Amino acid sequence: MSARDSDHLNGQCFPHPGIGHGTVVTVRITVLGCSGSVVGPDSPASGYLLRAPDTPPLVLDFGGGVLGALQRHADPGSVHVLLSHLHADHCLDMPGLFVWRRYHPTRPVGKALLYGPDDTWLRLGAASSPYGGEIDDCSDIFDVRHWVDGEPVPLGALMIMPRLVAHPTESYGLRITDPSGASLVYSGDTGSCDQLVELARGADVFLCEASWTHSPDRPPNLHLSGTEAGRAAAQASVRELLLTHIPPWTSREDVISEAKAEFDGPVHAVVSGETFDIQAPERV
């Protein structure tokens, strides 16, 4: 895996500059935003653009500022959306996407898919409505579907596996796998739990939240420290750990150091605008 500038997929695989002649990368993720809990001075809140051959562009989470960042990389009218949960920093740029899909001069044809927790339609409809107590019916622009824990969802050439994780609201980690076996696991927001380790088992890339530094006084079932993110990566035997969801008030350097103390593979804290190519290891 390597980071480099994004370019348009056009349904093709990517030559990987760091692996060898003829090797291709089939999954590409661009960090639209990675600031934890709130929009940061240098990054929107959570949002990640995922592209793969024979698959429509997907956005994992849609927090504050993500719609603006998305416009630098893809047509917002072309994307489908996968929401891990409905806390504001993961979904509240969605009303802006409602406006884009309804009122752009070249309005998108058909509906986009929107996957999320059970009350996605009601919660986002309330946020988008101009009147208190009313729901903006988004069924004209989105086909809203709900995650079911452990039930895989095919999207284009990819398979998405949602698993409930430990967070105060209904929250899912997602495992995305392509036909070659390349796998990305996104933790969403979670505290330490067995489901997260199970979901991440053997993943090529583990995009994992690390919202704070480690302390025994941290509340359970809310977020991970750098120590806990690194420990989960080690327990799951992932190939590479990408840390995300670090709030502006948390030291990135301390979180990275904590994770490295627990996990001996590559560790990197992502920044907005980075692009990563993901590939399964070559099989002998």
Swiss-Prot record:
Pfam families: Lactamase_B_2 (PF12706)
Gene3D superfamilies per the UniProt record, alphabetical: Ribonuclease Z/Hydroxyacylglutathione hydrolase-like
InterPro entries tied to this protein: cyc_nuc_deg_phdiest (IPR054857), Metallo-B-lactamas (IPR001279), RibonucZ/Hydroxyglut_hydro (IPR036866)
Parts forming coiled coils: none
One MF annotation (Gene Ontology) recorded for this entry: 3'-tRNA processing endoribonuclease activity
PANTHER family: METALLO-HYDROLASE YHFI-RELATED (PTHR46018:SF4), ZINC PHOSPHODIESTERASE ELAC PROTEIN 1 (PTHR46018)
NCBIfam families: cyc_nuc_deg_phdiest (NF041851)
Name of the protein this chain belongs to: Uncharacterized protein ML1173
CDD domains xref list: RNaseZ_short-form-like_MBL-fold (cd07716)
